[in-house]
From Swiss-Prot:
Pathway: Carbohydrate degradation; pentose phosphate pathway; D-ribulose 5-phosphate from D-glucose 6-phosphate (oxidative stage): step 1/3. Residues 1-66 form a transit peptide. Its EC number is 1.1.1.49. The modification N-acetylvaline is found at V67. It comes from Arabidopsis thaliana. NADP(+) 1 binds at G119, A120, S121, G122, D123, L124, A125, K126, R153, K256. Disulfide bonds join C171-C179. Expressed in roots, flowers and siliques. This is Glucose-6-phosphate 1-dehydrogenase 3, chloroplastic. It is an enzyme of class 1 (oxidoreductase). Optimum pH is 8.0-8.5.
């Protein structure tokens, strides 16, 4: 669990506050955050401190913040911190904030947040969702009044749920003396209700339990759907009609996959919107919550040395690389319905590409950022099958251990052509990126586990030192590498002179290794995304038109692969992948950066 700390007060708006509903809008007083002197350069791991993270978050919103002002004066968003001091800002601790705002309206009704994990007995809930919620509680990021309910078909008591959840909670980094005490307090807030996902009756019973724990407070409810996609709509229908909040907000987090193609994705969206508004649907892609992905826009827009270079004039190619060193063991049946393109490329890598390539947004508001991402996706050239290589891992022995092939998995149909590896060259047809290849590569059962972005710059025209750097010009390419996982890092490859007599060049790294630079543990992506969902911050969630544009790009390719029954190229388990991926890169005059010695 990461070391975090949370703000002393939070921004309160009709759209984003987890503690207020429309009931309190008339009583709000606008005020500037007294800590507005913080710079947006505040990027990365001090951004690991959620106190500063939330302050920066409140600064970048176009909406206004609200706290109570001592003399009743109004300080607007545009006010300076000195002006805020003049009117007398009263600092409100986060756990007392909802009480103060409620009292400012002359009432005594407090608010609460009820979080229901639908599919609570599944692996995702146990390994990611409950630990992330505990991390937020441990750092004081959850409101004073909150309740967590597990909901699943499995028969289980509250005590049994707590035992199950407790096995995955940890304070491994911080080693604070009150860790056990915090765990005990958190588990007391966790309850369980057994029910079918398509049963109105069972969700009515859940609603009654939620009301008992909400105790008449203003209720805000978050449902996390950690269930198979074929039962999303049933669960949403029941939750919306039988267990949604009547006086606060109701939000639903939906896990991928969001369909298999444009048609099924559109049908899913249409079905969800029968019961929810678009702003109630939080489509989660956990890669967007990873620290280095979130830092991507900060790196670009807050550092003058990068933004002027961020175009076809200086960048030769961009690579988005995802690799896992294990196969589909245990979940091959599920994976076979989707394949690596749907599982990784169409969502994780494409979302990162859109963030990387977008134009400067009007602001850091969620809608402005997502508008720019959609423009990128709509500008992308249709993907040709000739610019794609697919592969499937086969059995291979390493160090005396024999690893299975994909089709050795008993849950995978014999003779399956589902790719476990894919590489593709994509292009953006706009003025900034015309002609620049964006290469994606994703695979399972490879030689390493990693996720990274590699930006290879153009060669220096008329380079005076070509004679000193050998015949392979690619060896002297400047390259910016953003390593998302593991061992988060940002490094820039530069050429420099080797010390000594004579003139010999060497390539070295200017390296920001997060673990060496920052003592705090990086928060898990689910911590950030859950906190965003509670606060109503949508910047890292996928909007329906983004989803439509992403599927419009990949659906024709997937259809062609399946109709032609394209045979994947086999590669040994634990290798670098199929040889065809190297030919694809060479076709576009590119070398895969992850094959270099810096790995």
């Amino acid at each position: 669990m990461s070391s975090l700390s949370c703000p002393t007060y939070r921004s309160r708006t009709s759209s984003s506050s987890p503690f207020l509903s429309n009931h309190h809008h008339s009583s709000l007083i606008n005020v500037v955050d007294p800590r507005r002197s913080l710079s947006f350069h505040y990027a990365s791991p001090q951004g690991l401190n959620l106190a500063e993270l939330c302050v920066v978050r409140s600064q970048r919103r176009s909406v206004q913040s609200s706290v109570v002002v001592q003399d009743g004066s109004v300080a607007t968003e545009s006010s300076s911190s000195e002006e805020a001091k003049d009117v007398g800002v009263l600092t409100i601790p986060s756990l007392e904030a909802d009480k103060v705002v409620a009292e400012s309206d002359g009432g005594e009704q407090l608010s609460t947040v009820s979080i229901t994990v639908v599919g609570a007995s599944g692996d995702l809930a146990k390994k990611k969702i409950f630990p992330a919620l505990f991390a937020l509680y441990y750092e004081g990021c959850l409101p004073e009044h909150f309740t967590i309910f597990g909901y699943a078909r499995s028969k289980m008591t509250d005590a049994e749920l707590r035992v199950m959840v407790s096995k995955t909670l940890t304070c491994r980094i911080d080693k604070r003396a009150n860790c056990g005490e915090k765990m005990e307090e958190f588990l007391k807030r966790c309850f369980y209700h057994s029910g079918q996902y398509d049963s109105q009756e069972h969700f009515v019973a859940l609603d009654e339990k939620l009301k008992e724990h909400e105790g008449g407070r203003l209720s805000n409810r978050l449902f996390y759907l950690s269930i198979p996609p074929n039962i999303f709509v049933d669960a949403v229908k029941c939750a919306s009609s039988s267990a949604s909040s009547v006086n606060g907000w109701t939000r639903v987090i939906v896990e991928k996959p969001f369909g298999r193609d444009s048609k099924t994705s559109a049908a899913l969206t249409k079905s969800l919107k029968q019961y929810l508004e678009e702003d109630q649907i939080f489509r989660i892609d956990h890669y967007l919550g990873k620290e280095l992905v979130e830092n991507l826009s900060v790196l670009r827009f807050s550092n003058l040395i990068f933004e002027p270079l961020w175009s076809r004039q200086y960048i030769r190619n961009v690579q988005f690389i995802f690799s896992e060193d294990f196969g589909t063991e245990g979940r091959g049946g599920y994976f076979d319905n989707y394949g690596i393109i749907r599982d990784i490329m169409q969502n994780h890598l494409l979302q990162i590409l859109a963030l990387f390539a977008m134009e400067t947004p009007v602001s850091l508001d969620a809608e402005d950022i997502r508008n720019e991402k959609v423009k990128v996706l709509r500008s992308m050239r249709p993907i040709k099958l000739e610019d794609v290589v697919i592969g499937q891992y086969k059995s291979h022995s390493i160090g005396g251990v024999t690893y299975p092939s994909y089709t050795d998995d008993k849950t995978v149909p014999k003779g399956s052509l589902t790719p476990t590896f894919a590489a593709a060259a994509l292009f953006i047809d706009n003025a900034r990126w015309d002609g620049v290849p964006f290469l994606m590569k994703a695979g399972k059962a490879l030689n390493t586990r990693s996720a990274e972005i590699r930006v290879q710059f153009r060669h220096v025209p008329g380079n005076l030192y070509n004679r000193n750097s050998g015949t392979d010009r690619d060896q002297t390419t400047n390259e910016l590498v953003i390593r998302v996982q593991p061992d988060e890092a940002i490094y820039l490859k530069i050429n420099n002179k080797v010390p000594g007599l004579g003139m010999r060049l060497d390539q070295s790294n200017l390296n920001l290794l997060y673990s060496a630079r920052y003592s705090k543990e990086i928060p898990d992506a689910y911590e950030r995304l859950l906190l965003d969902a509670i606060e109503g911050e949508r910047r890292l969630f996928i909007r329906s038109d983004e989803l439509d544009a992403a599927w419009a790009l990949f659906t024709p390719l997937l259809k062609e692969i399946e109709e032609k029954k394209t045979t994947p190229e086999f590669y040994p388990y634990g290798s670098r992948g199929p040889v065809g991926a190297h030919y694809l890169a060479a076709k576009h005059k590119v070398q895969w950066g992850d094959l270099s010695l810096d790995q």
